[in-house]
Amino acid sequence: MTMIGVIDYGMGNLYSVSKALERLGCPYIVSGDKEELARVRGLILPGVGSFRDAMHILRETGLADFIRSAVQDGTPLLGICLGMQLLFDESEENGPTEGLGLLRGRVVRFPGVTNDGEPYKVPHMGWNRLRFHRSSPLLDGVEEGHVYFVHSYYVVPGEEEVVLASSEYDVDVPAVVGRDNVFGTQFHPEKSGAVGMSILNRYVGIVTGRENG
């Protein structure tokens, strides 16, 4: 059985995620077909672009309901960048838009100005250090190194306990989130060197453990 299904809904960074899985030796498919995705053991939801556009496509294709159902059935899910934001209740981007609602919280834009009135660059692009807050199988054996971010919006969590690691960019940015079989990274692990690859490898291990169980 194929290990991981990378969900293709037209807005994902599919090439770099696929290449990362190849480097890890993990069997995978890239597909937007629900029947194909139903046969894998774990899912990755990548994403680049607008929250509103992404949710529109996921709803129209039936993938939103498929993802919710798969998670409810115990299938591991990893959201990357926009894909992580989509896991939450809603986003303010281009007007309030309902997300997948798998984790509590909302997505808001960086203010672009500090509390002292100093402007800073949005989007946030570059390498920032992770700070771990809670243990998780996704972070077992992973170092608190630097990872690569590209985003203008960040998650304000409804429950602090879902924040496994954070980074700082004027505000405290949830960088790794997780609860039960739902995980997310705001950064691009596939572009984040050894630290990012170790996190992806841990996710593959989570999926593998489920298969062997």
Curated annotation (Swiss-Prot):
Pathway(s) this gene product operates in, as recorded in its UniProt entry: Amino-acid biosynthesis; L-histidine biosynthesis; L-histidine from 5-phospho-alpha-D-ribose 1-diphosphate: step 5/9
Reaction(s) this enzyme catalyzes, per UniProt: 5-[(5-phospho-1-deoxy-D-ribulos-1-ylimino)methylamino]-1-(5-phospho-beta-D-ribosyl)imidazole-4-carboxamide + L-glutamine = D-erythro-1-(imidazol-4-yl)glycerol 3-phosphate + 5-amino-1-(5-phospho-beta-D-ribosyl)imidazole-4-carboxamide + L-glutamate + H(+); L-glutamine + H2O = L-glutamate + NH4(+)
Alphabetical keyword list: Amino-acid biosynthesis, Cytoplasm, Glutamine amidotransferase, Histidine biosynthesis, Hydrolase, Lyase
SUPFAM superfamilies in the record: Class I glutamine amidotransferase-like
MF annotations from Gene Ontology: glutaminase activity; imidazoleglycerol-phosphate synthase activity; lyase activity
Active-site residues annotated for this sequence: C81 (nucleophile), H188, E190
Gene Ontology CC terms, in alphabetical order: cytoplasm
One Gene Ontology biological process: L-histidine biosynthetic process
Enzyme Commission numbers on file: 4.3.2.10, 3.5.1.2
Pfam families: GATase
Location of the protein in the cell: Cytoplasm
InterPro entries: Class_I_gatase-like, GATASE, Imidazole-glycPsynth_HisH
All residue ranges annotated as the Glutamine amidotransferase type-1 domain in the record: 3-213
Function as written in the Swiss-Prot or TrEMBL entry: IGPS catalyzes the conversion of PRFAR and glutamine to IGP, AICAR and glutamate. The HisH subunit catalyzes the hydrolysis of glutamine to glutamate and ammonia as part of the synthesis of IGP and AICAR. The resulting ammonia molecule is channeled to the active site of HisF.
Quaternary state and interactors: Heterodimer of HisH and HisF.
Entry protein name: Imidazole glycerol phosphate synthase subunit HisH
Native species: Geobacillus thermodenitrificans (strain NG80-2)
Gene: hisH
